């Protein structure tokens, strides 16, 4: 019987994490459970920075970006002795189960705790939308709006100066954020891990556009694929048109979550508590075709793959 639940946020922050925490806290308290917030992710869990939360702890947080519990990178959590200490801290507070909000690295920590017999539920909180078993992650659509606003502003200045602009977008090894941003932002070209890059073809396409009277272009590029500034130099040399790179960086993680992300996070937080009360542990939550689902967290990490949105890549190709 679950009586006390812990909740933490880990890895890169994402808009909507506070709404997810609120969903966990309010649902658990309403069911007569105690809730404990763990500050600064797995690092705080290891160091024992754990505090009991009440309803007022999550008042006025649903509209705030970031995470009031804080987050931290803590690669040392891979070590067995570190996790054993973390579990000791949980048991010292009488915490029976843990809700972890974060990306794939956070899921890996939850997986390790699960393998050590400690029940965890993972909620997908990352702007990268790179978690298997869910159509959307918490924060993804808010970040999408942030990127689109930036692209709109870049288009204003690019058209004024007849300039080619490269905009580097987060996502790591997943091109979802870049793909959707490129379609919604009306970008002329897209470079993601799924599409790869043929530089000669790209420069040729830009030259063809210039010959037809096109005065500017926006290129959407997923981070980590290449150096955006070096690519800008190559394009400028190949086309004779001024080319500049803009790295959006961490601005994509900030800002008030959209209504969609607030509702999604609230639903997932609520669902996580109900799963724990029903005796489920070692699960991760997702939303598929607007329905909440849960998967084995080990299977999700080791075996499940995110589908490539070939339908949207086809749309993008035909629109560009």
Swiss-Prot record:
ATP binds at residues 12, 73-74, 103-106. The keyword Thylakoid does not apply. ADP binds at residues 22-26, 155, 186-188, 212, 214-216. The active site is at 128 (proton acceptor). Pathway: Carbohydrate degradation; glycolysis; D-glyceraldehyde 3-phosphate and glycerone phosphate from D-glucose: step 3/4. Keywords: Allosteric enzyme, ATP-binding, Cytoplasm, Glycolysis, Kinase, Magnesium, Metal-binding, Nucleotide-binding, Transferase. Its main location: cytoplasm. One of its GO terms (biological process) is fructose 1,6-bisphosphate metabolic process. It holds the Pfam family PFK. The keyword Kinase applies. Mg(2+) binds at residue 104. GO terms for cellular component: 6-phosphofructokinase complex. Its cofactor is Mg(2+). Its EC number is 2.7.1.11. It is found in: Cytoplasm. InterPro entries: ATP_PFK, ATP_PFK_prok-type, PFKA_ATP_prok, Phosphofructokinase_CS, Phosphofructokinase_dom, PKF_sf. Allosterically activated by ADP and other diphosphonucleosides, and allosterically inhibited by phosphoenolpyruvate. GO terms for molecular function: 6-phosphofructokinase activity; AMP binding; ATP binding; fructose-6-phosphate binding; identical protein binding; metal ion binding; monosaccharide binding. It catalyses: beta-D-fructose 6-phosphate + ATP = beta-D-fructose 1,6-bisphosphate + ADP + H(+). It comes from the Bacteria. Substrate binds at residues 126-128, 163, 170-172, 223, 244, 250-253. CDD domains: Bacterial_PFK. Catalyzes the phosphorylation of D-fructose 6-phosphate to fructose 1,6-bisphosphate by ATP, the first committing step of glycolysis. Homotetramer. Belongs to the phosphofructokinase type A (PFKA) family. ATP-dependent PFK group I subfamily. Prokaryotic clade 'B1' sub-subfamily. This is ATP-dependent 6-phosphofructokinase. It comes from Vibrio vulnificus (strain YJ016). The gene is pfkA.
């Amino acid at each position: 019987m679950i009586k006390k639940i812990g909740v933490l946020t880990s890895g890169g922050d994402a808009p909507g994490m506070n709404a997810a925490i609120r969903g966990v806290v309010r649902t658990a308290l309403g069911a007569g459970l105690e809730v404990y917030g763990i500050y600064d992710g797995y690092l705080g869990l290891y160091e024992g920075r754990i505090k009991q939360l009440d309803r007022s702890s999550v008042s006025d947080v649903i509209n705030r970006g970031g995470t009031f519990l804080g987050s931290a990178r803590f690669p040392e959590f891979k070590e067995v002795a570190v996790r054993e200490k973390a579990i000791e801290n949980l048991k010292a507070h009488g915490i029976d189960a843990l809700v972890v909000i974060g990306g794939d690295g956070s899921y890996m920590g939850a997986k390790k705790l699960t393998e050590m017999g400690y029940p965890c539920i993972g909620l997908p909180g990352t702007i990268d939308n790179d978690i298997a078993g869910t159509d959307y992650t918490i924060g993804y659509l808010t970040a999408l709006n942030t990127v689109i606003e930036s692209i709109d502003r870049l288009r204003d200045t690019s058209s004024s100066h007849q300039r080619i602009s490269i905009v580097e977008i987060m996502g790591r090894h997943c091109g979802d954020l870049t793909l959707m941003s490129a379609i919604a932002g009306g970008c002329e070209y897209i470079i993601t891990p799924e599409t790869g890059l043929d530089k000669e073809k790209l420069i040729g396409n830009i030259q063809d556009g210039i010959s037809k009277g096109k005065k500017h272009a926006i290129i959407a590029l997923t981070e980590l694929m290449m150096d955006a500034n070096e690519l800008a130099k190559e394009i400028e040399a190949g086309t004779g048109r001024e080319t500049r790179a803009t790295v959006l960086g961490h601005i994509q993680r900030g800002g008030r979550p959209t209504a969609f992300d607030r509702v999604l996070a609230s639903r997932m937080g609520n669902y996580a508590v109900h799963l724990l009360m029903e005796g489920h542990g070692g699960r991760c939550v997702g939303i598929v075709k607007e329905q909440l689902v849960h998967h084995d967290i080990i299977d999700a990490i080791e075996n499940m793959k995110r589908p490539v949105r070939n339908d949207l890549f086809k749309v993008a190709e035909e629109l560009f």
